[in-house]
């Protein structure tokens, strides 16, 4: 877009640019650009904050509106003592108010619901096996 022309090699590069243009100091932006899926992003984020010696008490979780529940579940698992504020972004024209009005919206939301059960169930099994 005109506001963020890029080019960006990673999602992290784009989001860093957004934050810097909004006045966030560069030293406040932590780098995690190795994850390729949501749960891995939560894992890597935890590694980054632990390596920096940060205790995260409250965090804002920015994600696509239809993806918020699953992202929150993963981050709550990795940061059990953190209070999360979910900031859903309407993307692809899909919001909490209109998702059911199009086939694409319904497919995305129902697919997320399915993954909340199937993926999270598998993650929890592995999580408890480690204990």
Give short role names for the model-derived ranges.
Residues 1-101:
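A structural signal for short, hydrophobic/glycine-enriched beta-strand patches
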Residues 96-131:
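A structured, mid-to-C-terminal "fold-capping" secondary-structure block
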């Amino acid at each position: 877009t005109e506001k963020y022309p890029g080019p960006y090699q990673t999602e992290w590069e784009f989001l860093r640019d957004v934050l810097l243009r909004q006045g966030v100091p560069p030293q406040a932006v932590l780098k995690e650009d190795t994850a390729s899926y949501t749960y891995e992003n939560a894992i890597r984020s935890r590694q980054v904050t632990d390596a920096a010696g940060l205790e995260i008490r409250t965090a804002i979780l920015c994600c696509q509106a239809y993806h918020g529940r699953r992202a929150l579940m993963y981050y709550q698992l990795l940061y059990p003592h953190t209070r999360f504020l979910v900031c859903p972004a309407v993307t692809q024209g899909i919001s909490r108010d209109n998702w059911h009005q199009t086939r694409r919206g319904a497919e995305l939301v129902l697919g997320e619901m399915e993954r909340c059960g199937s993926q999270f169930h598998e993650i929890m099994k592995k999580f408890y096996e480690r204990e």
